[in-house]
């Protein structure tokens, strides 16, 4: 193809640089011919977001008032409804904010093993604090602990996923959980994570849809089942959901329907009434507050990826590839050194609990589906004398 012909190719804007249709379709071809989990496939620079996947853990908490005021509701039924409202706002930030910011969906950077992310939000009840750590790299797995001590509310979460390509769509199966604990009531809410489909690839405008169902299961016997649907070829509304709240083996108390990036309504079947529930566009998200990058440790996300992020922001993809390759090679070298010395990487804040029977039984019995065993339990700082944001060079489990 001549230079003139190349300049006339259809393009799409990505960051500060237009991407040609042929370049984009080459990327799609790589997806289609790749075998195995897509997390092991190195993505081209033009589709990267410049933000580490570990930092995405914070998106669940960008409406801190909805989070901390869950404890204010007087009955288990109302608290379940409050948990659902917080969860829906988290979906909107976790799975739609990149599309809003960039105009199209972007792939996050894969965190390195041991990567750390800290931050906080102010709320009417006190500070909400987050500690996150990349606890596995192959396959990728992140864990986080979030607490508002004054409100007596904590969240522990971990996320791992499997991904693949079929037809025109990337599918991501999320296998982790969110667990919300309310100290005052000794209540725990076990929450499964939605499966994701990345649509619009053939039109050079990828966006996320959620599909299937997720569950919120409480030890109060209240259950929420959330069904997701999207825009089909001929019908349907993008980002639609229907949530049904019921006590185990009882009729529904509440039904919430709408769009998890837009508005939703609450129906109370016993009263045969429908009222307003939530309007995402009317809410203003509160991004996490972090310390200045100059004060961050070497293992903190924004420090690890700062040169890659800066190059992505300027559209210099050669520098992106070079800096990203340097980080990845350093990690490979570290793993080889550990293997040669018989060392195993130990996590700073979390420990894997294989036989997490209480949660597994609660979820499996309630939703009648297989729940993968185990959970990354927050155990506090195993190296309190070490500055935040740092990891020992070599550690034994």
Curated annotation (Swiss-Prot):
Major subcellular location class: endoplasmic reticulum
Glycosylation positions in this chain: 186, 195
Gene3D superfamilies: 1.10.287.2720, 2.40.160.120, 3.30.70.3490, 6.10.250.1430
Domain of life from the UniProt record: Eukaryota
Subcellular location: Endoplasmic reticulum
Annotated GO MF terms: oxysterol binding; sterol transfer activity
KW Transport (keyword) present: yes
InterPro entries reported in the protein's UniProt record: OSBP_sf, Oxysterol-bd, Oxysterol-bd_CS
The protein's name in its UniProt record: Oxysterol-binding protein homolog C354.07c
């Amino acid at each position: 193809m001549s230079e003139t012909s190349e300049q006339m190719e259809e393009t799409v804007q990505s960051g500060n640089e237009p991407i040609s249709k042929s370049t984009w379709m080459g990327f799609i071809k790589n997806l289609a011919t790749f075998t195995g989990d897509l997390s092991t496939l190195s993505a081209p620079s033009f589709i990267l977001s410049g933000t580490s996947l570990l930092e995405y853990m914070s998106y669940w908490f960008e409406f801190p008032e909805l989070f901390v005021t869950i404890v204010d509701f007087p009955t288990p039924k109302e608290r379940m409804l409050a948990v659902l409202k917080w969860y829906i706002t988290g979906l909107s930030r976790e799975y739609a904010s990149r599309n809003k910011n960039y105009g199209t969906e972007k792939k996050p950077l894969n965190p390195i093993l041991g990567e750390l992310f800290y931050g906080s939000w102010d709320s009417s009840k006190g500070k909400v604090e987050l500690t996150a750590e990349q606890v596995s790299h192959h396959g990728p797995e992140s864990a986080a602990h979030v607490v508002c001590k004054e409100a007596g509310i904590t969240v522990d979460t971990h996320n791992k996923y499997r991904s693949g390509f079929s037809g025109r769509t990337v599918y991501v199966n999320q296998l982790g959980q969110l667990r919300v604990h309310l100290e005052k009531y000794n209540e725990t809410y076990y929450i499964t994570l939605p499966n994701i489909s990345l649509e619009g690839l053939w039109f050079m405008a990828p966006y996320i849809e959620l599909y299937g169902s997720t569950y919120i299961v409480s030890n109060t016997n209240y259950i929420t089942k959330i069904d997701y649907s999207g825009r089909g070829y001929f019908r349907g509304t993008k980002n639609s959901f229907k949530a049904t709240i019921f006590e185990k083996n009882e009729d529904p108390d509440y039904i919430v329907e709408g769009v998890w990036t837009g508005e939703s309504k609450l129906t109370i079947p016993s009263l045969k009434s429908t009222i307003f529930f939530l309007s995402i566009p009317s809410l203003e998200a509160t991004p996490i507050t972090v310390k200045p990058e100059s004060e961050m440790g070497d293992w903190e996300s924004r420090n690890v990826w700062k040169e890659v992020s800066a190059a992505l922001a300027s559209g210099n993809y050669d520098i992106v590839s070079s800096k990203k390759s340097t980080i990845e090679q350093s990690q490979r070298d570290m793993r080889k050194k550990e293997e040669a010395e018989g060392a195993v990487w130990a996590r700073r804040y979390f420990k894997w609990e294989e036989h997490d029977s209480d949660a597994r039984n609660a979820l499996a019995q309630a939703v009648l589906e297989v729940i993968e065993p185990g959970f990354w339990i927050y155990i506090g700082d195993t190296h309190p004398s070490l500055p935040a944001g740092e990891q020992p060079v070599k550690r034994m489990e």
